Regions:
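Short Pro/Gly-enriched beta-strand edge/turn motifs at strand-loop
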Residues: 1-2, 99-102, 123-127
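Conserved beta-strand hairpin/beta-sheet module of binuclear metal-dependent hydrolase folds
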Residues: 1-48, 141-152
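Short, well-ordered secondary-structure micro-motifs
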Residues: 16, 91-93, 124, 142
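Divalent metal-coordination and catalytic microenvironments
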Residues: 18, 29, 59, 71, ...
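Short, glycine/acidic-enriched loop or turn micro-motifs at the edges of active sites
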Residues: 23, 32, 62, 85, ...
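Hydrophobic "anchor" residues on beta-strands that sit immediately upstream
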Residues: 25, 55, 78, 131, ...
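Active-site HxH/HxHxD metal-binding segment of metal-dependent hydrolases
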Residues: 33-38, 42-121
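Core dinuclear metal-dependent hydrolase active-site scaffold
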Residues: 118-144
Length: 152
């Protein structure tokens, strides 16, 4: 599995693109807020010929979901996350005002609910969703046993 890390937005947060030899990929936490960040993510995916199969969120705090509408528009992907965090989507506009800015795009609803133990497959790679409530009630980490790595 190959990994590309981006650091996005004013908070900042990490976004990961994971892919394997099949060029199937997942994007984790697309926190791209600024237009140049969105273009950097899109350009990387396009230039590497990646076929993004899943958009995964570790949790749904504001800084981790900025790019979800962009991913839906550009790649037709709805986010996958734990249902216990879904309320954060409705809170996003209010949260952004608390931090002194407006969202550029309205948050989009989740496409799939992930649960503890769910397996996400892309190409020949498998990630296990592990529910780790604490930072947020629906926090998930994604573990790749074959490569001994975890994304949180």
């Amino acid at each position: 599995m190959k990994i590309k890390r981006f650091e996005f937005n004013m908070f900042p947060e990490n976004c990961y693109v994971l892919w394997d030899e099949t060029n199937e990929a997942v994007v984790i936490d697309p926190g791209c807020f600024y237009e140049e960040e969105k273009q950097a993510l899109k350009n990387f995916i396009t230039k590497n010929g990646l076929n993004v199969k899943h958009l995964l969120n570790t949790h749904l705090h504001l800084d981790h979901i900025f790019g979800n509408p962009f991913m839906l528009k550009e790649f037709g992907l709805k986010a996958e996350a734990n249902q216990a965090d879904e309320f954060w989507i409705d809170e996003a506009p209010k949260q952004s005002r608390m931090f002194g800015f407006q969202l550029q795009e309205a948050p989009v609803p989740l496409g799939t609910y992930l649960h503890d133990g769910d397996i996400i497959t892309f190409g020949n790679t498998k990630l296990e969703a592990i529910h780790v409530p604490g930072h947020s009630p629906g926090s998930l980490v994604y573990y790749c046993a074959a490569d001994h790595c975890m994304f949180s």
